[in-house]
């Protein structure tokens, strides 16, 4: 994959972004947190089985909840849909289940926020758009990325050909 600029499909401009992606060849952004709407099972463009290769998949971005935070806050019907689709078995393992789903997708690029690797809740959220104060303050502690975590991350990257 060349150095492309991921086109962020903001909801109000989705049709313009889709055309830009088609015309330019820029990779599209796919945010897993946007995939699980129980009212449209199987058809949502953010579900991994609907991806093309020319995209960048994220569990979430700096503007979203952490994966663990999202899982705890999302509507029950959407959480149950995500459980069935991703294979989540508990809140404790949810973030890693979503990380695995991102890695096994066909997306050319996979980006995982460190907070999700660390299985942190919304206390580690980076930004809450349209709010003042408290944004961009989270910092990873120096000893947070243990050797065990690094090995787990490496194993996932190697297993899915993303090393």
Mark where each language-model region is.
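Short glycine-rich loop/turn motifs that provide flexible caps or phosphate-binding loops at active sites
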Residues: 1, 59, 132-135
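Structured C-terminal cap/extension of enzyme domains
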Residues: 119-163
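Short, small-residue-biased leader/transition segments that mark boundaries at the very start
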Residues: 3-10
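Conserved active-site loop/cleft motifs that coordinate metal ions or position small ligands
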Residues: 8, 109-114, 137-140
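Short loop/turn microsegments at loop-to-beta-strand junctions
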Residues: 1, 53, 127-128
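Conserved alpha/beta catalytic core and glycan-binding cleft of carbohydrate-active enzymes
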Residues: 12-122
């Amino acid at each position: 994959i060349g150095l492309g600029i991921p086109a962020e499909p903001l909801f109000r401009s989705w049709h313009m972004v889709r055309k830009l992606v088609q015309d330019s060849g820029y990779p599209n952004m796919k945010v897993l947190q946007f995939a699980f709407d129980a009212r449209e099972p199987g058809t949502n463009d953010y579900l991994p089985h609907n991806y093309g290769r020319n995209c960048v998949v994220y569990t979430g971005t700096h503007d979203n909840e952490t994966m663990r935070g999202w899982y705890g806050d999302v509507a029950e019907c959407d959480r149950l849909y995500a459980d069935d689709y991703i294979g989540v078995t508990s809140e404790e393992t949810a973030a890693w289940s979503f990380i695995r789903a991102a890695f096994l997708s066909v997306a050319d690029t996979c980006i995982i926020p460190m907070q999700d690797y660390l299985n942190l809740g919304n206390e580690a959220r980076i930004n809450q758009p349209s709010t003042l104060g408290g944004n961009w303050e989270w910092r990873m502690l120096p000893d947070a990325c243990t050797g065990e975590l690094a090995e787990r991350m490496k194993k996932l990257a190697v297993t899915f050909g993303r090393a």
